[in-house]
Amino acid sequence: MSDRKTIADSKRAFNHDFPHVIPSLYRRTTDELLVELHLLSHQKHFHPDALFAIGLSQVFDVFTSGYRPEAHVKTLFDALCRSCGFDPNALRKQAQQTLESVRGHDLEEVQGWIQQQGKGAPEALAKALRNTAGSTTFHYSRLMAVGLLSLLASAQGDESSDPEKLSQIAHELSESVGFSKARVEKDLNLYKSNLEKMAQAVELTEQILESERRKREQNESAKLNTGSSEQMSQGVEACSNIS
């Protein structure tokens, strides 16, 4: 990520790797992620650690829910990352390994690891926590806050399935990982708000598509019935002529 690209360069690289029309429902998210990744690629003290990888993967996966054609989703993620100098496969692997490292552990234990800045935690998580909590120069990204929230959600326990409780815990733990409480609260509130709006938009889109599908089926059925009626009428007329 050493080349000093402009945003125009990153967009050009993205369009080269993903030469497809993006549905309007997903265009804004794509543009925002592209700009954010571009800006992060120029931050001297930014490192794509596990919390960032988890957050990026989570935001992308959630906000591309229902994307069609499905085959384009992976290509879209890859193009976003590569156009800004990030390795999509490495980020996905990093996110997956870190999330898997906390599965099977209860939420209280995971909280303890975070509060102790990675002490006793699986190496994948400990490394990410050392990067943030142990540094005064690291560059924060809102995707890291989402990564922290998603990490907590992967732990076992009833509280792990309670979004409000998880957000509260993430807020309380933010300073332990070197994040600003105010920033984390703001970023997670915005994330949840956008999540609700996106879910509603996807649901509405699916309803519209389903309605259009039914109309097409009804029209096709009507055409078939009309054709059958015409054929029957012609047959009756032919019989009458013979008589």
From Swiss-Prot:
Residues 210-243 are annotated as: Disordered. InterPro entries: Thf1. Residues 210-220 have a biased composition (Basic and acidic residues). It comes from the Bacteria. GO terms for cellular component: plasma membrane-derived thylakoid photosystem II. Pfam families: ThylakoidFormat. This is Protein Thf1. It comes from Prochlorococcus marinus (strain MIT 9313). The gene is thf1.
